[in-house]
Amino acid sequence: MTVKTRFAPSPTGYLHIGGVRTALFSWAFARHHKGEFLLRIEDTDLARSTAESVNIILDGMKWVGLNYDNADNVVYQTRRFDRYKEVIAELLEKGHAYYCYCSKEELEAMREKAEKEGTATYDRRWRPEAGKTLPEIPAGVQPVVRFKTPLDGVTKWADLVKGEISIPNEALDDLIIARADGTPTYNFCVVVDDYDMGVTHVIRGDDHVNNTPKQINILKAIGANLPEYGHLPMILNEQGKKISKRSGDTVAITDFGAMGILPEAMLNYLARLGWAHGDDEFFTMEQFIEWFDLKDVSPSPSRMDLKKLYWINGEHIKITTNEKLAEMVKPRLALRDIHETSKPALEDVLALVKDRAQDLNALADECLYFYKKQVPAEADVAKHWDDEASARMLRFAERLEGLEDWNTEAIHDLFKPFCDEEGIKMGKLGMPLRLAVCGTAKTPSVDAVLALIGKEEVLKRIRA
């Protein structure tokens, strides 16, 4: 059997990090088992689904690097209405579905009664049964189609995350599978799609647990093999509450990209939300695929920890090639009015500073003074700069100008003799030198920084 999983987002807005975590686990499960990972766009909500939102999903999947095996044949539910109508007709013909002519007022009265009695909402008055007389069909009412849910027994499954789950069928409604205008409903479309796509494992959020028994019963009615189900726990914010954009939480995957998070780091972090492999916190996607097993997913909710996300991001920055980092940092430097990054080469700058930043925005800031002297902070000036320091910098500039070989080692060899002559410690030279050349007291080793900036530029900045 070829393992087939799917990710099935609705294009009604941004791509939520919870959705990306679901996609990640489905993707990793398929890749671990040498199977297929498929994408389906559940766009039957015609009022809310937009082409822009579809592109947001596709772009988000591309950004995080979750490749799907049906890239040339992504399933769109709105293109499958004929297929849904075909299956509905089959269910009606075989007695697994029926027409219901209840009015909105009747359904509202049933709902209120059910809430008081704790029973299923719909009283099944239009459900055909042996020896039962159905009401007279009202004039001018377009019926819905309801699925004929079994009245006895239980629907159960061995959830790959939550364990055994059992739901009495008497607690389930005869759910609507086609609205009065003929459009199919979510739970029905999902079943037909999973069946036609050959999905073997449905991995999704635990907000779908209540949908599962309904979908299992429909699958049984159409004679399909049942997939296995695994329901993932919710992701909570740092306060332990449901993630919400209204609460100020970052929820869209694109927002994390704007925050300077690497795609690989985002996936690494999301993988650790609810799943564990010993004490491993930092790993590659190749390692994750090798290690991933749904039995290691906790059924309990996970809590966001932005501090840990940034730490993981910093670790991924360290192992990312300077060439790849340069492509991501250049646009950020352009936003900071730095457009020329060949002198010094940005790749060389990144090699020196990438250990000092935990996100791409901070990394871009670390590169600024290599291309343009920054305005020193008042606190740094007060602490490290005075007339004596200014005069000392001019004297040291003469030593620098005399260097024939301009490199880190040659610059470093000037420090001790100069400090001895001046009767000062290295801090009295290094900190003012950083301010004079870079405009900040916080840099990597100052000899390496000067070597990269270049002799002519260094002397010009000191003497400015």
Curated annotation (Swiss-Prot):
As recorded in UniProt, its EC number(s) are 6.1.1.17
Q: Which Pfam families does the entry mention?
A: Anticodon_2, tRNA-synt_1c
Record InterPro entries: aa-tRNA-synth_I_cd-bd (IPR045462), aa-tRNA-synth_I_codon-bd_sub2 (IPR020751), aa-tRNA-synth_I_CS (IPR001412), aa_tRNA-synth_I_cd-bd_sf (IPR008925), Glu-tRNA-ligase_bac/mito (IPR004527), Glu/Gln-tRNA-synth (IPR000924), Glu/Gln-tRNA-synth_Ib_cat-dom (IPR020058), GluQ/Sye (IPR049940)
Per the record, what are the reactions this protein catalyses? tRNA(Glu) + L-glutamate + ATP = L-glutamyl-tRNA(Glu) + AMP + diphosphate
Where in or outside the cell is it found? Answer: Cytoplasm
Main localization of the protein described in the UniProt heading: cytoplasm
Motif 'HIGH' region per UniProt: ranges: 9-19
Which residue numbers does the motif 'KMSKS' region cover?
A: 242-246
Taxonomy, superkingdom: Bacteria
Where, in this chain's numbering, is ATP bound?
Answer: K245
Tell me yes or no: is Nuclease among this UniProt entry's keywords.
no
A single GO cellular-component term from the record reads: cytosol
Biological process according to GO: glutamyl-tRNA aminoacylation
Give the molecular function GO annotations.
ATP binding; glutamate-tRNA ligase activity; tRNA binding; zinc ion binding
Matches recorded under CDD domains: GluRS_core
Establish whether keyword Protein biosynthesis is in the entry: yes
Alphabetical keyword list: Aminoacyl-tRNA synthetase, ATP-binding, Cytoplasm, Ligase, Nucleotide-binding, Protein biosynthesis
Q: How would you summarize the oligomeric state and partners of this protein? A: Monomer.
Give a short account of what the protein does. Catalyzes the attachment of glutamate to tRNA(Glu) in a two-step reaction: glutamate is first activated by ATP to form Glu-AMP and then transferred to the acceptor end of tRNA(Glu).
The record's comment on protein family reads:
Belongs to the class-I aminoacyl-tRNA synthetase family. Glutamate--tRNA ligase type 1 subfamily.
Q: What is this protein called?
A: Glutamate--tRNA ligase
